[in-house]
From Swiss-Prot:
NCBIfam families: PRK01117.1, purA. GTP binds at residues 39-45, 67-69, 334, 360-362, 442-445. Its cofactor is Mg(2+). Residues 1-24 are annotated as: Disordered. The gene is adss1-b. HAMAP family: Adenylosucc_synth, Adenylosucc_synth_vert_basic. Pfam families: Adenylsucc_synt (PF00709). This is Adenylosuccinate synthetase isozyme 1 B.
Length: 454
């Protein structure tokens, strides 16, 4: 992982009158881990590997709608809002300005993980003062909007009802409340809180808001988080331009859930592609180093929306059962299908992956043959792009390559040579098709079952 410093070699030759021009130093670079499908690819596991020797681990977007499970020494930790690097006692965890924070959720998550052995997290967590606050009424509105969508269109987005969408809506309409507002003049904050609550009540007549109760709770949380809050821009600038440091950015959600590039409208409300790293932390693009894409060896999706390689048959059921495919945040069953290299290529176009992590390869161990989606056809013609429109995406026919299964247990593999030849061929096929090397292969739940290839 790149903790190196780079300088821009526009050399400092003397200009007119012998004046020595300053030389721009790029500073440290951040390593980024992003989901390359519809989420649940196993990003937490890759982050966990890299977090062990990172100095700073950051979250740049999303909220507690994300769900990461990390297994350490047989204990399962569940993280939603915390960077999963919080379990590294030597690292600082940073929640950036692009994240939306539900304070009761933050402390509930801390309590649950403290019971499993997480210690001194409050000494290692830093929160950007520019991050927006998810209020309890944002969560209530999330549920009401979903009911409304169901009634009007007979379909819902499948939101986690964590208030993420309504909070980003408040942010975009410039009525949102930020951590810095909560920590300054509380009377001013209270007035703005009441205005926002009344705005939502005028839209949803059945929305009940205990204004005084919520403000009382927020005042209590304000004092609890005050020691953790910093100016995030200065914090990141110092981290990039101080001594050499390994900085890791943990993406939440995934490319196909991105508000701009995902399968809109069945997406989340933030940019979960690489651009969200710069806007969600306040760092320049030249400080982005390696970008690792995490992809499952098959494809899953939670909730409704187009899913070209979905298998509503025995193959899909087998993947769901063997892969234990239900959500960390919602407990909902995930829809399952074959690996789709069209969406992976599309995610690479946007993110510029420097390497991939291919997870859950072992789930395919029992299959006689494995299909891989390699191209889309629309009205019988191959198309060279990923369609933006949902109706068109529903009509797509997938062109498959059929590969022989390896029919043997890979869960004990710890290096490349331990993998069956046909499994190696599957990995090579993905690499060749996308033009990006696979750096890790996952064959089980534990940290040890991530095989590092280079």
């Amino acid at each position: 992982m790149s903790g190196t410093r780079a300088s821009n070699d526009r050399s400092s030759h003397p200009g007119a009158g012998g004046h020595k021009r300053p030389r721009y130093d790029v500073g440290n670079k951040v390593t980024v881990v992003l989901g390359a499908q519809w989420g649940d690819e196993g990003k937490g596991k890759v982050v966990d590997l890299l977090a062990m020797d990172s100095d700073i681990i950051c979250r740049c977007q999303g909220g507690n709608n994300a769900g990461h499970t990390v297994v350490v020494e047989g204990k399962e930790y569940d993280f939603h809002l915390f960077p999963s690097g919080i379990i590294n006692p030597k690292a600082i965890s940073f929640i950036g300005n692009g994240v939306v924070i539900h304070l009761p959720g933050l402390f509930e998550e801390a309590d649950k993980n403290e019971k499993k052995g997480l210690k001194d997290w409050e000494k290692r967590l830093i929160i950007s003062d520019r991050a927006h606050i998810v209020c309890d009424f944002h969560q209530a509105v999330d549920g009401l909007q979903e009911v409304q969508r169901q009634a009007q269109e007979g379909k819902n987005i499948g939101t986690t009802k964590k208030g993420i969408g309504p909070t980003y809506s408040s942010k975009a309409s410039r009525t949102g409340l930020r951590i810095c507002d909560l920590l300054s003049d509380f009377d001013e904050f209270s007035a703005r809180f009441k205005n926002l609550a009344h705005q939502y009540q005028s839209m949803f007549s059945n929305l009940e808001v205990d204004v005084d109760g919520q403000l009382k709770k927020l005042k209590m949380y304000a004092e609890k988080i005050r020691p953790m809050v910093r100016d995030g821009v200065y914090f990141m600038y110092d981290a990039l331009h101080g001594s050499p440091k390994k900085i890791l950015v943990e993406g939440a959600n995934a490319a196909l859930l991105d508000i701009d590039f995902g399968t809109y409208p069945f997406v989340t409300s933030s940019n979960c592609t690489v651009g969200g790293v710069c806007t969600g932390l306040g760092i320049p693009p030249q400080n982005v180093g390696n970008v690792y894409g995490v992809v499952k060896a098959y494809t899953t999706r939670v909730g409704i929306g187009a899913f070209p390689t979905e298998q509503i048959n025995e193959s899909g059921t087998l993947l769901q059962t063997r892969g234990h495919e239900w959500g960390v945040t919602t407990g909902r069953k995930r829809r399952c299908g074959w690996l789709d290299l069209v969406i992976l290529r599309y995610a690479h176009m946007i993110n510029g992956f420097t390497a991939l992590a291919l997870t859950k390869l072992d789930i395919l161990d029992v299959l006689d043959e494995i299909k891989v989606g390699v191209a889309y056809r629309l009205n019988g013609k191959r198309i060279p792009y990923f369609p933006a429109n949902q109706e068109i995406l529903q009509k797509i026919e997938v062109e498959y390559e059929v590969m022989p299964g390896w029919k043997s247990d890979t869960t004990g593999a710890r290096k490349w040579d331990d993998l069956p030849t046909k499994a190696q061929n599957y990995i090579r096929f993905v690499e060749t098709h996308i033009g990006v090397p696979v750096k890790w292969v996952g064959v089980g739940k534990s940290r040890e079952s991530m095989i590092e290839l280079f």
